[in-house]
Amino acid sequence: MLLKKKRYMFDERDDNNINSPVAVEPSSNNNKMADTREVRIEEQLKVKIGEAKNLSSRNAANTSCSTQGTRDVYCTIALDQEEICRTPTIERTLTPFFGEEHQFKIPRRFRYLTIYLWDRDMKQDKPIGKIAIKREELHMYNHKDHWFSLRPVDQDSEVQGMVNVEVAFTEAQQTQSLSEGIDLGQHTLRHHQNLPHHSHQQRAHLNDYKENSELSNIQRASAAAASSSSAAMTLKTRAAGLFGHVHHPPSQTQHFPIINTTSTSSDQLSNWKSHGRFVGVTIKVPACVDLAKKQGTCDPFVVCTAHYSNKHQVTRRTKQRKKTVDPEFDEAMYFDLHIDADAGSTNTTGSNKSAGSLESSANKGYSIYPVGGADLVEIVVSVWHDAHGAMSDKVFLGEVRLPMLNKQEQQAVNPSAWYYLQPRSMTHSSRSLNATPRSCATPPGTRLSVDSTIGSLRLNLNYTADHVFPLATYDDLMNLLLESVDQRPITVSAVSILGELVSGKTEVAQPLVRLFTHTERIAPIIKALADHEISHLTDPTTIFRGNTLVSKMMDEAMRLSGLHYLHQTLRPVLSQIVAEKKPCEIDPSKIKDRSAVDTNLHNLQDYVERVFEAITKSADRCPKVLCQIFHDLRECAGEHFPSNREVRYSVVSGFIFLRFFAPAILGPKLFDLTTERLDAQTSRTLTLISKTIQSLGNLVSSRSSQQTCKEEFTVELYKKFCTEQHVDAVKHFLEVISTPSHASSSVHPAAAAATPLEPVLLKEGLMTKYPTSRKRFGRQFKQRHFRLTTHSLSYAKSKGKQPICDIPLQEIASVEQLKDKSFKMQNCFKIVHNDRSLIVQTTNCVEEREWFDLLHKICLMNSIRMQYFHPSAFVSGFYSCCGRSDENSPGCKKVLDKTMDYFQMDLVTALDPALDLQRIHTLIMSNMSVLESLLDPLTYHQSLSQTQHQQHNPLVPLATDLQKHSPQAFAEFKRTIEKLREKAYAIDRDHRDYKQGITRQLKYGSRQAPIGDDNYWHMMRAAGQLNQQHHQQQQHQQQQQQQQQQQLQQFQPQPVLPQMQNVRAYPYQPATSNMNAYCLHNMQYQQQRLPFHQQQQQHHQQLQQQQSQFQPLRSHQLQRHNNNLNNNNCGNGSSSSPSSTTSSVVAAPPSTTSSSQPAPPIY
């Protein structure tokens, strides 16, 4: 389909993600780009925390006692410094093993992924160390385990956020006093030069507020002394100038040059204009964004410090802002670019020197102060938190350094720009603004990876960031994938090719399952893939035992469509097991008291019986789409193995028990079955239950009900459950779930479980509520335990208590995000129901995103959904957004009308086909070289001749098999690959144009590309590399075409010699002594009788006559001869030259028959 192209650009939006690009109308030029309204960035992160090693003990004061004592250790995962999740505490160890896996979507912009390692203490938990990895570097560690060195956590390293700094330079006032000063003399000029200085100094004092306690009494006294001495020197200089001479001590020289009275006035005026144009600079910090919190709060203020070349410092600060991480300041702070030399003797940093020592140090002969005064070197803009009641009255939040040493640096400063806050410099000599801080992420194998005195932590990361275009952009690719359902054989389809192309089957299975579930064709595609896989098996016990594409797609389909069925079945019984914490260990080697084995066995049998009963009685609640898939698998297995009746059960139990129920019992947190932290005893209990349930599922595949036990201590356990009664219950369960209903054809497969018999728990957790409708005294923010089910939203004082409030889902009218300035708190949203509102705050941004998405989908389904709302809270008798005093007044902002055409809005699944298609496109582009190698004949022949290439190209065995058995299927296989390449390159062009458009419109120093990080330069470099890669791809394709032509020319016959024009080649026969047997038609006697020149004329005429007649025949004959030479490995290997052709040719018998025709070439 034809798509209208538009240009994309960055635009700041109301939500937290300021890096969200949106499309705007194209400009006057007709540049075509990918379609339409919006391009969104979907980021997802999976973190596996393994183990830590080489941790120092808590009481380790030196190396000798470093092995004494242990720690209680746990980890937290944070985006910048906002904690997202944490691991359980591993007690009394220095080598903790966590084995935790956390996966979540990233809802906002961040700079660093930070993993903290904590030591739990009675008083306060203390950080042992941390790992900070830049967002741009996360992809370097995907899918592999890496050891990272822990870095110390201090106040200077805990920096985050941005600051907006405005810089304005003040020019010297050039009035009529300038010419008067030139005529009257040197003293008058200096008098007028000192006037701006004192006026600006007076303005600077106005910005010094009462709460500015940085200057001590000594500093104030020294500053006053410097001011009075400067005034005295002005009078002294004026008086001396009247008598014709001026004496300048070294410490009192002026910073402006002395104008010679003997020169002309025009020269003096030009020197004045070219020298010292700027006399001061004004710094203003309008806003800061996303500052770090200290002890859960932030009361920021800004301090500006001017550093001069004589080590003099001038400090200004703003007023404090209360309880906000996004403060705004309106103060302007003024600093002189040049100060007098005597001012350099006063140090405002709090030195304890006396006045005499300062004067003596200023009059030393080896002073390094500049002649004429001191220049401004740099201005440090730092942000601080006012911690009242703490040991330190202020906490460092970050700083920005602005160089001001010379005119070049002053002109390089952006008048208004955003800066990333940087850690505090370790030494005062570090004055470089562009100096990047040392990264805390340490790749393995480097010198820094072993240079760690704190310890190391093993992590496995998987970070994905997809730029998702509107669904219309992927229409061609989606249609190509959907055609796979009807293609036969299935191996020539796009889905099968992707399964063989990508090594990680889970990466390609997940988007494929979600895409085909959205189009209601998941059952047919799994049936086609399963039928092809089962047809190539000879042993029924190995069905779906490997990690093939169809096995992974079945795993994803069960988890996608059957997740809430799993919650209904196992959540109640698992909650009891976690809460009761009964010991169930039956291994004698792991129990100190052997008499407790019988009691533990009884507890374990009771738990297994509960779980088994919950599973077998849940067959009626199995989703219809899963019933249809199980039915198709059973029919395919019965068709290929008709003599084996057990295979009809084992093919279903292999998925539902071995790949669904057993893994969910073993790891309930991975399937969202519980949010509790499991201790070692509970984990061991769940492991034993999972093994038993898996063994019960295997009973239907064996001909006897007694199964061999792998461990001796499980004999008594299996005796109770390996009975005919349990086997019949399992078979009945499998029969029911593999029998589809007749009404399933009219019901959406993904929405089959949307009407459960009892409420399904969607989400629960702790949140802070603020009821705006009630008028009460005291604290209104209260922490409550919220539960969201398919029926209602409720909250109670704690988990398990009676709900205080229960809101039916039908009564929820609107859910919208709030501005952070309403309560000066983050992660808040408003729930409106029955003309009342409830404001809720979550613990972090990820929780806010999950709760908001679920409630927003419910509101989209409600008929009473509101159209307008108030984006702010009703505080102090009015709405801060619109100023209305009536609490029941209609909203002032329209509810976001998000078109969810390509989203399936139900409570079971929320599918996003555009995101899934983008992930598939990313997989295709990452493996494009493998696809193109199959379309290149030269590379394909090399991969066939060398076995090493088959390991790098997984499609070569499939292509060889298709070429051998079915040339038509092989041709269809090539056409599918060409279509995949064509569709992928079309989408890639849209991505390239989009990124180039962003790069052209992005400004360095804006809020989207702040100064102080290399993100902008990475983007610029990436945009340049996109063009370069595009040109390289075109050049590579041209080179491949040239190589193909050269290769084909080598295979084509060489120009035939004049003596060989009528030579016909015949294949080798065993009866013939000469392999190169040619037949020459009556040419020898004519060449012997005719003169040489007549032979040439006659030969030339014959060539012209026979060229059009024998050219096709000659080409066919010579090609068949070359093929025969390749098929026959014996012979003389002799060649005929033009002079010896007549003597080397031997006539072949005309009755010779040709050999079997070889296989046709690929191209």
UniProtKB/Swiss-Prot annotation:
GO CC terms in record: plasma membrane
Boundaries of every PH domain copy: 762-860
Domain Ras-GAP: 520-737
Tissue: In third instar larvae eye imaginal disk, expressed in cells posterior to the morphogenetic furrow, in all photoreceptor and cone cell precursors as well as in still uncommitted cells.
Annotated site location: Arginine finger: R545
Function: Inhibitory regulator of the Ras-cyclic AMP pathway. May function as a negative regulator of Ras85D/Ras1 in the sev signaling pathway. Acts cell autonomously in cone cell precursors as a negative regulator of R7 photoreceptor cell determination.
Covalent S-S links between cysteines: none
Keywords: GTPase activation, Metal-binding, Repeat, Zinc, Zinc-finger
Pfam families: BTK (PF00779), C2 (PF00168), PH (PF00169), RasGAP (PF00616)
Record field: compositional bias (Low complexity): 1091-1157
Organism: Drosophila melanogaster (Fruit fly)
GO molecular function: GTPase activator activity; zinc ion binding
Highest taxon in the source lineage: Eukaryota
Name used for this protein in its record: GTPase-activating protein
PANTHER family on file: GTPASE-ACTIVATING PROTEIN, RAS GTPASE-ACTIVATING PROTEINS
